[in-house]
Design a protein with these regions (language model features):
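Short amphipathic alpha-helix that is part of the acyltransferase structural core
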Residues: 1-57
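Conserved N-terminal entry element of GNAT/NAT acetyltransferase domains
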Residues: 1-16, 171, 179-199
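Short hydrophobic/aromatic beta-strand element in the GNAT-like acyltransferase core
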Residues: 35-38, 47-51, 61, 95, ...
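Conserved acetyl-CoA-binding loop-helix of GNAT-fold acetyltransferases
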Residues: 98, 104-117
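Conserved catalytic-core motifs of GNAT/GCN5-like acyltransferases
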Residues: 129-131, 141, 146-161
Length: 203
């Protein structure tokens, strides 16, 4: 599905932008999931808000939380495990949603790809954390995320912490050196066979 993306700080959001974002979050996370929880939090002030639009209508959304933000510090303070520590020192992506009528067309992957791309540009080589609902583990794994916590309940819904680390690239130099060694060995064998053939002909 083709759509347009907008990335804004909280202060750059218009009142209309904010209305549609909060409406969508309430529709998906409160009404659809039948989960009464406090969606509007003070974390929004420090986030970047990524919105997917089609014909000027919000159809998808997520927010990017900076490393060491208030939310990250709060989570780390509440827990002593390594998962909270990782999330507290890295950027994270949250409140990922697609409105029901636009699901199944790859839009969630597009939004996550855009969010990851921005995190890499803004925060460099830091890992990227998410708190994923467990039924979406395979989707996030397909983007490179791996679980790093036990399952836990958050607002009555099962979640797991996941992280996207930079993949180590195999150095082309090592690949070339292996190929060179094989090629040199084959040339040596051919040279020996050639010399053996000459000796045989001379005798």
């Amino acid at each position: 599905m083709s759509c347009e993306f907008s990335l804004k700080t909280f202060d750059e959001l218009t009142s209309v932008d904010l209305y549609h974002i909060l409406k969508a979050r309430s529709q998906v996370f409160v009404v659809e999931q039948n989960c009464a929880y406090q969606d509007i939090d003070e974390v929004d002030f420090d986030c970047l808000h990524l919105v997917a639009y089609k014909n000027e209508k919000l159809i998808g959304y997520c927010r990017i939380i900076a490393p060491n933000s208030n939310k990250s510090k709060l989570k780390a303070a509440k827990s002593h495990n390594s998962a909270a520590t990782v999330e507290g020192t890295t950027p994270s992506i949250g409140r990922v949603l697609i409105l029901p009528e636009y699901r199944g067309d790859g839009l969630a992957r597009q939004i996550m790809t855009q969010a990851i791309k921005y995190c890499r540009k803004k925060y460099g080589k830091k890992p990227i954390a998410i708190s994923a609902q467990t039924y979406l583990i395979r989707f996030y794994e397909s983007l490179g995320f791996t679980p790093y916590s036990e399952f836990y309940l958050e607002d009555g819904i099962e979640h797991v912490d996941m992280v996207l680390s930079l993949r180590k690239k195999v150095k082309a130099k090592n690949q070339r050196s292996s190929s060179t060694k094989i090629l040199n060995f084959l040339l040596l064998v051919l040279a020996l066979l050639f010399i053996a053939g000459l000796i045989y002909l001379m005798v």
